[in-house]
Each structure stands twice: as structure tokens, then as C-alpha cells.
Amino acid sequence: LRKYINYLVLLLLCACVPLASAYAQSGPTAAETVSEKDCGITLSGTVTDHERRSVLIGATVVLEGTPHTSVTDANGHYHFHDLCPGTYKLVVSYLGYTSERLEKFFRAPEVVNFRLHPDALLLRSVEVRAARQREQPTQASSHLSGRELAQTQGQSLAQALERMTGLSSIQTGPSIAKPVIHGMHSNRILVMNNGVRHEAQQWGSEHAPEIDPFVASELTVVKGAAGVRYGADAIGGVILVEPKPLRDSAGTSAVLNLVGVSHNRQGVVSGMVESNPAAVPSLSWRLQGTLKQAGNSKTPDYYLDNTGYREQNFSAAAGWTREKYGVDAYFSRFHTKLGVFSGSHVGNLTDIRNALQRERPEPEADFTYAIGVPYQNVTHDLLKLHAFYRTGPSGKLHLTYARQFNQREEYDAHGDRSRPGLRFEIETHHTEALWEHPLIGNLKGSLGASYQYQFNRFEGRFFVPFYESHTGGLFWIERWEKNQWHLEAGLRYDYRHLQARMYRKDTPQRTGQAGPDNELLTPTHTFQNLSGTLGAIYDFGPHLNLAFNAATAWRSPTTSELYSNGIHHGTGTYEYGNANLGVERAYNFMATLAYVQNKRLNGEISVYRNYIDNYIYQEPDTVPTLTIRGAFLTARQKQANATFTGVDVSASYQLTEHLAFATKASLVRAYNRSADEYLIWIPTDRYENSLRYTLDKLGAQGTFAQNFIQLSGLAVARQRHIPDNYLARDYAMPPASYFLLNAEAGTTLQLGKQQVEIGLIGRNLLNKAYRDYLNRFRYYADEVGRSITLRVSIPLHF
């Protein structure tokens, strides 16, 4: 215990070193902040009428205490360019309206939108958005941007999202994680990458989203059924990965990010450069790339064999924007080679029993960056072309085309190691037309149509067949706002045609009919259904609002759920599909009470209930499947009526000027109504508390800015809401509850005009050995032990 305490004290002392230098230094004034020129920050936004949402032309926006003033243009936009990081006081005024004020610290380009009230109305709160302008959704949503997002650098997308309430991840060892929203994941969660629906082999629990988190300036999660806007399958929610808009002011800037992680000796280098040429102001472009390498991960007591990975990612964007129209293009490539924990691939029934009983996995391993078999090689390309045309003062037509190509190669520990045992290739073409119609009184909305073509093929041993699908959709969403009320309604129709191709020998247990093994089968499925949403928000005052949403969504079974028959490489299981599966239909109800933008207390509580008819789930079969390659754990697809009920709570309280306390909790219960029992593999209860100490300026002339240190504790309960006779469904009981002590610290070092942002994160500081219920490899090994992450970000301006 003394050793653990010494480690913790040493970490806290290292993070607090700057505090001893100049605790009494005062923060900068706005005037001091803007005295440095060419710092490169752009502050912009729109000024509108709060009730009618019409733009206010000629509104004055002043940075109080500085000579900077901006007047809104014909679209209600204002701009400030080349600002330095610091605290600014914005004052917005317009004849006949009550002025608005906002004091805020800005460290990066932001969009701040103001909604002014006529003089007869009370002063309202200011809406702040760190990305594109958006309406407040009637569903619960969470955002991650700015410094909080930067603190997640080096983590996967799923790990970054765990900072939000209601989100967790399902893991397959230490290197693969998929996001979970309110107990649902994979095909029930849509990921929108730069406005394009991410399409890959997402049916696999070990198929993490092929997205580089460094491309995002904001991550947004819409919780609950969201099928109207984003299409069928969005039963659990939607994850929006949003890059920042292309630069709209003349100049060139760049950023270099460096990350090091201790538990797997991971190193990350990521860079971005963007420009808006002064000679061609309508043109903007951006280049971005990331290199990542990690070796075997270490638990408190041993290394996990063959758990290293490598990534090489690249993206490029360019846009041409005029007052009435604009076009832009985006291309990204994600490539990774990642090892699959060798202890999960066993050879016979005795190996399975021994693996479940032993405390340490076999084979024993040391640290290495080498990646052996089994491993996966994954490449994902995305090409997006987008154009818009303004159809009036507030209307806009969007046209989008996207092509995605995903190749997944899986190399086995058995057989020919020079070629993949299985190669998947899936190609997707997606088009969408969206019209945001002009304001009609207090009504604003959008209409759209989409079409998607998809083709999947494979080489090697059979697991999922060839298939071809056509999907089309029509949607209409309207929003009415007046005074304290915000009402939203939407309707969508989707149609899907699916045809698979396979030989009878690959599906004998599901066809129910005799025939020659080499007979080609082409089963066809047609699905069509409606999705709808109805929501409302009522503002009680500047800080308090209540939102309610009722929505329905649906999901057709995937090809893997219908026809899988083989070894699922990443999980080391033999999976059987079910050709008799029907369509899932979800009815989601959610209410959110939020108290926000208060100087001392802020909080939010969301309660939800999601009824899902014909819920498709995978259940382990305790009888392993024997193959010529060995014995494998077995899983089968089943269907039942289910109910998901839960609550998300988050709150923060400013104890003093510098010290804040925050807490959050997420609870979800998933019940099989058909069998009158709980469902398996559902997230357990999670509770997290933190104390955060901040100090704006330290050192001579504020050398250290935005200083903070945070200590937090995460408690995860044992999953006790499980079916009776659990060991008839799974190979081991849910693991014990656990507590993790974590810490973070950060500062921004000011070296003349050059800034260097430094962050230090410690996870599992007590080096606790534990296993997580949602890790598919919990049968074989512990989770990662103590891990220290050092992050350095260097912005550059030219």
C-alpha cells in the first residue's frame, strides 16, 4: 500500500510544481490578451431574433476593452480574426433589442451564436456552440470539444466517448473498443463521419470504427432512437464525428500533436496544416495525418501476448465558397494492423477449461512491438463530395455523394500464415439531397432523400456470404419555436432490398431443406418501414429547461445475423446466424431536465425507456464447436421482445473560484420480456466523482496558462441483473466490481508568441487487477494496469 501511495503522491507533486511558482499571479485582461497580433484564432457567429430565428443585419458585436468591433452582414454573420487565446467580453446590441453579454475564455476557433430578445422580453441566456450552428435537440445529447476533447488524444474513438454520461464501450482485448450508448452498440449505433454514415463490417463486436479521432474538432452523441434524420438502424443513438470548418480567414496555420502512453509504450505523432490563400479567398484546404504504434499491453502482473497495433491515417479536404454557393471535397484513409490476443485462440475443450480456470493466460509474454498471428489488417477509404446553394435568406440546398471502401484481412494462427484466412471487402455508394427550407413564420425545417448501394464480397473460409443491398429513404423534419416553447416533429420512410449468395454447404443448419452442397442459394429479403419523432423543450428561465422526446425507429437484421456460419476471428468464437430473424422495432421515450450556464451549479438528468420488439441478440452456447482448427466458444443469434430502462445523471459545483466538484452516473437495465428475465452483456452501473483545481495564470508574465489538476475515481459495479441459471448462457459469472483512481493535469506554456499545450493523464493509478464485464476476453486475462499518458500539442501560425 505504501508503494501505491508513494506513486500517487509523486504524480500529484509533479502536476503541482507550477502552483508553487506564483500562486498569487493575476489573470490577464482582455486588452493584454489581444495586444499580441497574428495569433490566428477566429471568433465568429450569427446574430438572430430569438423568437422568429430571422437574422439581424447590422447588429454590433464588440470585444469590450479592445478596439475590435464587428457588424453583422446580410446573413447575420460577424467575424473577428487573428485573436490570441484569452478571456474576452462580447457585447451584442441591436436597435429595439436587449443587449447580450458573454465573458468566456477562448483557446481555439469557435462559433458563438447570439439570439437577441426584443426589449419587452427578459434577458435570456446566450447559446454557445463550439462548432457549426445547430438547434438544441429534444433528445438527450452530449458534446466533447476543445480542451476536453484534446485530453483524449491517443485514445480510440470509443474510449474518448466514455467521458460522456450514458456511454461505455465493449472491448475485445486492450486494443479494440466499440462505443455503447444506453446498452446498445454495433448495428444499433450510427456513426456519422464528417456528415457521412460510416459503413464497414460494423456487425463485429471487435470491429472498431475505422476513424482517426484526430480529425474531429467535436464529438456529439445523440442518445436514443434517431432514425428520422439519419436513417434506419439508429435505435440506440448517433455519434457525430465533426471536423472543424475549413479556414475562412486568410493565412496558414498548423498543429503538431505528440502522445506517449506507458502501459503499451505507445507513440503517436499527428499533424495538421490548413490554409486560406489571401490571393484566392474563396479557396480553403487542409491536410492531416497520424502515425501510431503500440506494443504488448501490460496488466498489473503480466503482458498480454500479441496485443500491439500500428496505424497510418491520412485525410485531405478542400473547399470553394461564395456567397450563394459552395463546393467541398474530403478524402480520408484509415489503416491499421492489430494483433489479436493469442490466449483467446485455443485448440481443444481442455484448453478452454484450463483458460477459464488459470489466473494467468498462456502463452507467457514479454514486451514487444512485433505483431504475430492471429492479427487483422484493416483499410478504410472515404471520399465525400458536397455542394450547397442558398435558396433564399434562410434556405439552403445540400447535395452529397460519398464512396466508402473497407477491406478487412484476418490472419489465423493455423494454416498458411502468408495469406489471410478471410478477407472481407465492402463497397458503399451513398447520395443525399437535403433542403433546409426558408422560415415560414416560426416554422423551420428540412426535407431530404437518400439512396445507398452496397456490395460485400469475401475470400477464404466462409463466415458471412456475398451480398448486395439497395437502401432508399425519404424524410421530413419541422421545428416550431416561440417564446419558451420548442416543438419538433419528423417522419421518415425507408426501404431496403437485400440479396445474399452462398452455397448450400455453408448453410445446412438454417435452410431446413436437403440438396447438393454446391448448389448456389440466393435468398432475398425486402424490408420497409416508417420512423417518427415528436419532441418538445420548455425553457423555464435562463438556466432551467425540460425536454421530452418520443421516437420510433426500426432495424432490419444484418447479413451476419441472418447467415453467419464460422469462426469469428477477433473474438475467437464460432457464430451461427438465424435466417428466420425479423425486423426490430423500437419505441423510445426520454425526458431530460437541465440546469445550465450557472456560475456555480450545473447539472442534467435524463431518464429513458426503450421498448424493442424482436430484439436481436447473441447468446453464448455452453457447448463449444469443434473444428479441424480446434475447439471454439459458440454463440447463436436469438430474438425476443426487450425493454431498456435507464438514467444518466451529471452535475458540477464550483466550490471556490478555483476548485470544482463533478459527479456523473449511468444505470441501465435490459429485460427480456419474452422470457421474463434480464438480458446478458449489458453495461453495469458506473459512478464517477472528480475534484478539479484550476488556475488561469502562473509564472512570470503568465508563462503557464490554463493550469489544472484533477483527481477522479471511477466505480463500476458487478453486473447482478442477469438471467437465472447464468452459467447455462455464459462461460463464467460476471466479474467483481472495481474502483479505479485516475488523475489529470495540464498547462499551456507561453513561449513568446508560441504556445505549447501539455497534458498528463494517469489511469488506474493503484495498479488494480480487475476484469470488465463488457470485455470479450475477460475469460482469459485481466485489464490493463497503471498507465501514464503524456500529451504535447504545438499550434503553429504562419
Residue ranges and their predicted role:
Residues 240, 276-372, 509:
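Periplasmic-side early beta-strands and strand-to-turn transitions of outer-membrane beta-barrels
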Residues 258, 287, 397-412, 545-551, ...:
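Membrane-embedded beta-barrel scaffold of Gram-negative outer-membrane proteins
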Residues 8, 613-614, 661, 715-724, ...:
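C-terminal beta-signal and adjacent terminal beta-strands/loops
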Residues 27-38, 46-51, 59-64, 93-97, ...:
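Short, acidic, small-residue-rich periplasmic hinge/interaction motif at the N-terminus
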Residues 111-115, 157-160, 177-180, 192, ...:
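N-terminal periplasmic accessory domains that precede
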